[in-house]
Amino acid sequence: MEPFKYICHYWGKSSKSLTKGNDIHLLIYHCLDVAAVADCWWDQSVVLQNTFCRNEMLSKQRVKAWLLFFIALHDIGKFDIRFQYKSAESWLKLNPATPSLNGPSTQMCRKFNHGAAGLYWFNQDSLSEQSLGDFFSFFDAAPHPYESWFPWVEAVTGHHGFILHSQDQDKSRWEMPASLASYAAQDKQAREEWISVLEALFLTPAGLSINDIPPDCSSLLAGFCSLADWLGSWTTTNTFLFNEDAPSDINALRTYFQDRQQDASRVLELSGLVSNKRCYEGVHALLDNGYQPRQLQVLVDALPVAPGLTVIEAPTGSGKTETALAYAWKLIDQQIADSVIFALPTQATANAMLTRMEASASHLFSSPNLILAHGNSRFNHLFQSIKSRAITEQGQEEAWVQCCQWLSQSNKKVFLGQIGVCTIDQVLISVLPVKHRFIRGLGIGRSVLIVDEVHAYDTYMNGLLEAVLKAQADVGGSVILLSATLPMKQKQKLLDTYGLHTDPVENNSAYPLINWRGVNGAQRFDLLAHPEQLPPRFSIQPEPICLADMLPDLTMLERMIAAANAGAQVCLICNLVDVAQVCYQRLKELNNTQVDIDLFHARFTLNDRREKENRVISNFGKNGKRNVGRILVATQVVEQSLDVDFDWLITQHCPADLLFQRLGRLHRHHRKYRPAGFEIPVATILLPDGEGYGRHEHIYSNVRVMWRTQQHIEELNGASLFFPDAYRQWLDSIYDDAEMDEPEWVGNGMDKFESAECEKRFKARKVLQWAEEYSLQDNDETILAVTRDGEMSLPLLPYVQTSSGKQLLDGQVYEDLSHEQQYEALALNRVNVPFTWKRSFSEVVDEDGLLWLEGKQNLDGWVWQGNSIVITYTGDEGMTRVIPANPK
């Protein structure tokens, strides 16, 4: 066969750092390196095969042929002199006969995007009047739907972060200047030659040609191609070595591609993307020694072995996590998924889940990569320990939970290991306008996505979550949603995202309950056939007390101190940080007996919050120190997934579903001994003494739900509240859309609430549309901005100006730190406060979204004096805002 005329004159990778060997890697070799990774990964994952072959009549062999063909075209935009002159030395080395021609300017090369240009050139070449023999001859035949190629080309050329669509592209931006016409002609011939070569390499052996119509393009292709490109660029001393020697013919290229399979297998192993799965052994394998499956756990083996959406409703502490994990294990064992992703509402709950998953990971995989992803995961000591273990003990028996360094380099890669634990916003990014969102989409698509505390999300976030569920359904993925209970309307909306059937959910009063919906139908599972596994019926004694602004009065505070003196573990849950701080201060003033009092909320630095969280778990956890009485004043941070246990709970009024979450921390664990007077679980609920809920409506704006919850509490009239009965009886009626007799102020409040909800739904739809048009940077500030409607916080950096520079709260001087240390110091010393505080400051936010606030250090801590407010910070109380009686 004749040597190649054009394609061997283009470089794909260039490096001056290699100490030996070539410093140029031919473009055609790089493209085949990437295709080799895709080929090897395909062979190792039945899940990926089934995903790409979903709803296709073509054989897997032919789908794979098209897949490799298009992936090898991912860098077609590099067949362009404007890219080649990014390393003019490399170009001239490969083209010694053309050094005298004037090349493109440095500025032109710097602005050149080979991904976007690749899509442009594919579009232009396809419309060209010049014929490319078999390849573009089909463009002359009007009936041929050549548009079927564009989704594939758009996906693979978008591998650097954002998928462009041909019809939306500014084509004038990529037109070749007339001064480069001679180069343009050669570039076009090279692209045509490369397409013909790829046809011979991949399509012809599968009985296909470029005149055939490819299958529908999977939404996972962009992520798959991007990952293959990352790994195919992983040049080491023994993988994907640079090579600038031109192949003699097509057979030499075929041999090169086959030889790269070993390199591909090696980098896949190094990356941590693949792992050996362990055979499913049942839910009992995940339980501690001596424990047997209970409640819904006994139903796992009966659940469908098929992709679907599963909604698990069960009481707090009933083993929902193990139920979900066992079902995920079962699906992985049957090659319906490759991995597991746990998404939780907060960083604290994600940290707690990481601890639980470390013990379970080795049951599912022989060498699992366990990854934690949220804005502060790099400061989680357990996660850092797991990462270090992978380095120091790789290959040894005790290294049974690994954390591949490559996977842990960024949050987006959490979705590529075997078990990922993250905050929910990391999942929502997969459908939002953020760079490389399709990497997250690929990871989710090949995983069982488990979303915990699904009741905790507002309308905006639920709108985004529904988009994630629909995307998962489109690729045949699986999702498990966990909640103590869900209102019927919300459950219906979630289930309707999956499959073609949208039959109404039967109003089944059974509890606990599993609803499953797949492509071909729906099933429901309960414990009616296993009455011995029904959760034990228990009661809580509500004690409603009406107080101004729902604030504990002197009598209540004194009762709390007396209870702690009697040995009780007492918790007061406040709806607002400011309220919690005031209550804490008043308790400290009244505490003459030195009862241990803690304050826990979200307005601490990361270091202080971590210390507070550990102290709370140590004192009030399952194995906490219960030798003396204590008091914890907290906000909502204790109501979600933290395993804490109190003898007496006092809580400000809140919606019923969240109230039940809080009550789940009361007598959470069976104990032989409770202090005298606290043998029966009593929950004191602070209600308003008049109409309306005041500032609490800023947090819980559904006034109707708040009012109906209050009515249910008051209607008990001293009777006990029985669980699990209340989950269904209360929530279904409280969240019922049907109107009932209610005061005028409730109706007025609902008008405002429904207007705000409508705006949130609109924002969710709008931001989902933006995902097709824009690409924002993948950083913490962007993630917060697009995933949490109206909840954007303001990161404050308190400091004291010294002669050496800015001294941060932990005592470090910012200017004395290295760049890496500065980055870490900013994360550890900032405090997130409500964004509304910004109007009190004249200081401006810097380019990283931080507001530096210069204050002074006194004996009590850091203090800043403004015109109308005083802000202080101590490790004990966190950041407080005080409005003086006589402001400046």
Swiss-Prot record:
Keywords (A to Z) from UniProt: Antiviral defense, ATP-binding, DNA-binding, Endonuclease, Exonuclease, Helicase, Hydrolase, Magnesium, Metal-binding, Nuclease, Nucleotide-binding
Q: Which Pfam families match?
A: Cas3-like_C_2, Cas3_HD, DEAD
Q: Does the keyword Metal-binding apply?
A: yes
What is the originating organism of this protein?
A: Escherichia coli (strain K12)
According to the UniProt record, what happens if one changes K78A? Loss of CRISPR immunity to lambda DNA and of CRISPR-mediated plasmid curing
| Binding, ATP | A314, P315, T316, G317, S318, G319, K320, T321
Query: What Gene3D superfamilies does its record include?
Result: 1.10.3210.30, P-loop containing nucleotide triphosphate hydrolases
Q: What is the effect of changing H74G?
A: 75% R-loop formation
Q: Which residues form the HD Cas3-type domain?
A: 20-231
Name all Helicase ATP-binding domain ranges. Answer: 301-504
Fill in the subunit field for this protein: Interacts with the CasA subunit of Cascade once Cascade has recognized target DNA.
PROSITE patterns tied to this protein: HD_CAS3 (PS51643), HELICASE_ATP_BIND_1 (PS51192), HELICASE_CTER (PS51194)
Q: Where is this motif: DEAH box?
A: 452-455
Q: Name one GO biological process term.
A: defense response to virus
Residues where Mg(2+) binds:
D75, H160
Q: Mutating H455L has which effect?
A: Loss of R-loop unwinding
Recorded hits in SUPFAM superfamilies, A to Z, give:
P-loop containing nucleoside triphosphate hydrolases
A GO molecular function assigned to this protein is: 3'-5'-DNA exonuclease activity
Q: Could you say what the effect of mutating D75G is?
A: 10% R-loop formation
Its EC number is 3.1.-.-, 3.6.4.-
The protein here is known as CRISPR-associated endonuclease/helicase Cas3
By sequence similarity, the record places it as follows:
In the N-terminal section; belongs to the CRISPR-associated nuclease Cas3-HD family.
**What outcome is recorded for mutants in which this gene has been deleted?**
Loss of plasmid silencing.
Q: What does this protein do?
A: CRISPR (clustered regularly interspaced short palindromic repeat), is an adaptive immune system that provides protection against mobile genetic elements (viruses, transposable elements and conjugative plasmids). CRISPR clusters contain sequences complementary to antecedent mobile elements and target invading nucleic acids. CRISPR clusters are transcribed and processed into CRISPR RNA (crRNA). Cas3 plus Cascade participate in CRISPR interference, the third stage of CRISPR immunity. Acts as an endonuclease, a 3'-5'exonuclease, and an ATP-dependent dsDNA helicase. Anneals and unwinds R-loops (in which crRNA binds the target DNA, displacing the noncomplementary strand). Unwinding requires ATP, annealing does not. Required along with the Cascade complex for resistance to bacteriophage lambda infection as well as the ability to cure CRISPR-encoding high-copy number plasmid.
Cofactor(s) listed in the protein's UniProt record: Mg(2+)
The source's superkingdom equals: Bacteria
Q: What is known of its domains?
A: Proteins of this family have an N-terminal nuclease domain and a C-terminal helicase/ATPase domain. In some CRISPR/Cas systems the domains are swapped, in others they are encoded separately.
